[in-house]
């Protein structure tokens, strides 16, 4: 199979979808790999590294897309890439379609077969291809929150860990999944006062056991969220419904009651965000104000640490890439139920019901297409 790796074009997105070791494994299995020139530079991977592993370097994104049977990306296609997609081609990347009707429409109109990293789901409900980027974003959230709590970052001038005789920052983490637990761990490491909120009591019990009382936990409901958010210096939104739009947990009216200079970091922005006033921002212009609070809603947070993120991502995606390349997408999905759940579109058909529900579009299950 011909596997193509174009450069990412989203603002400040320096990750790349394949490393030289991945190229080596694909070539060893009998496949051809085509990489756009300089695609790996942001992740400190040079063209020469790809060539040494067996890849062919192409000069433009158009050449890569035209050549490839299987296109590997990190982020969803944006408008300038839509014309490159075609029927008979397979795209394997993060899609987050519940938050993007234009991208969904473009995929359906092109007829491309698209498989989303974030909806590949194991029998235990875990999301193996989303987990590493959730971990990165979760670990970054307290860092960016701490910066923006500083007065030079636009915040109320609070130090996360406080000092002797002065209160530490109050951090509320909404969601105790991979990103939420990662955020809580880093915030605790910064010596903040941390409250973890989730509706899953088993997860909260696990957090209590891990951190032995060093953080507080509370069951999620509207009353407790309101109390926590009003008292918070930093709120980190880390909720997820696989494939679907994130639930809205913090209203505009609630933000109006927050402390002046408080900060909200929405990790869930890829799936539409969990704050009413959230809208996607970029690393170049990451924040905006609502009432007297500062919102940080960068949709590709891990893109700011591309070296770490690229290797963390490709560690988990490569086995699935090899399955698709070795068997062809249809047989690979038939053989692997977890991978089958990643199928989002196929020749103009939406195959992810949670996306259909979020966007009001007709959909079928992956099994209906595969069978």
Show which residues each predicted segment covers.
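Rossmann-like adenosine-cofactor binding region
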Residues: 209-291
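Glycine-rich phosphate/diphosphate-binding loop of Rossmann-like nucleotide-binding domains
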Residues: 6-45, 152-237, 287
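Residue-level detector of alpha-helix initiation sites
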Residues: 76, 136, 177-178
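Adenosine-phosphate binding glycine-rich loop
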Residues: 118-159, 269, 274-371
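An N-terminal-biased, well-structured beta-alpha scaffold segment characteristic
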Residues: 2-110
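Short glycine-/small-residue-rich Rossmann-like dinucleotide-binding loops
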Residues: 69, 75-76, 95-96, 221, ...
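Glycine/serine-rich phosphate-binding loop and adjoining beta1-alpha1 elements at the start
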Residues: 2, 8, 79-169, 298-300
């Amino acid at each position: 199979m011909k596997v193509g790796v174009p450069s990412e074009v989203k603002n400040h997105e320096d990750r790349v979808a394949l490393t030289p070791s991945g190229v080596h494994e694909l070539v060893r299995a009998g496949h051809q790999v085509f990489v756009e020139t300089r695609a790996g530079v942001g992740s400190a991977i040079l063209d020469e590294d790809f060539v040494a592993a067996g890849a062919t370097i192409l000069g433009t994104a158009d050449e890569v897309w035209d050549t490839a049977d299987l296109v590997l990306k990190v982020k969803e296609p944006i408008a300038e890439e839509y014309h490159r997609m075609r029927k008979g081609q397979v795209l394997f990347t993060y899609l987050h379609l519940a938050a993007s009707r234009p991208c969904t429409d473009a995929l359906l109109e092109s007829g491309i077969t698209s498989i989303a990293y974030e909806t590949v789901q194991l029998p235990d409900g875990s999301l193996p291809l989303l987990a590493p980027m959730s971990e990165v974003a979760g670990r970054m959230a307290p860092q960016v929150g701490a910066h923006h709590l500083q007065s030079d970052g636009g915040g109320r001038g609070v130090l996360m860990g406080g000092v002797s005789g002065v209160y530490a920052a109050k951090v509320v983490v909404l969601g105790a999944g991979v990103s939420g637990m990662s955020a809580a761990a880093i915030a605790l490491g910064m010596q903040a006062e941390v409250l973890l909120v989730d509706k899953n009591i088993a997860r909260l019990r696990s957090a209590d056991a891990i951190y032995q009382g060093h953080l507080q936990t509370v069951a999620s409901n509207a009353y407790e969220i309101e109390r926590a958010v009003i008292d918070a210096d930093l709120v980190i939104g880390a909720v997820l419904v696989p494939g679907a739009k994130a639930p809205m947990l913090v209203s505009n009216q609630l933000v109006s009651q927050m402390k002046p200079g408080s900060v909200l970091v929405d990790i869930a922005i890829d799936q539409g965000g969990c704050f009413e006033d959230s809208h996607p921002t970029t690393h170049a212009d990451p924040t905006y104000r609502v009432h007297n609070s500062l919102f940080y809603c960068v949709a590709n947070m891990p893109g700011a640490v591309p070296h770490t993120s690229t290797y963390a991502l490709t560690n988990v995606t490569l086995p699935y890439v090899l399955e698709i390349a070795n068997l062809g997408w249809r047989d690979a999905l038939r053989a692997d139920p977890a991978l089958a759940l990643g199928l989002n579109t196929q020749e103009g058909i939406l195959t992810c019901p949670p996306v259909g529900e979020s966007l009001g579009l007709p959909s079928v299950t992956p099994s209906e297409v595969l069978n």
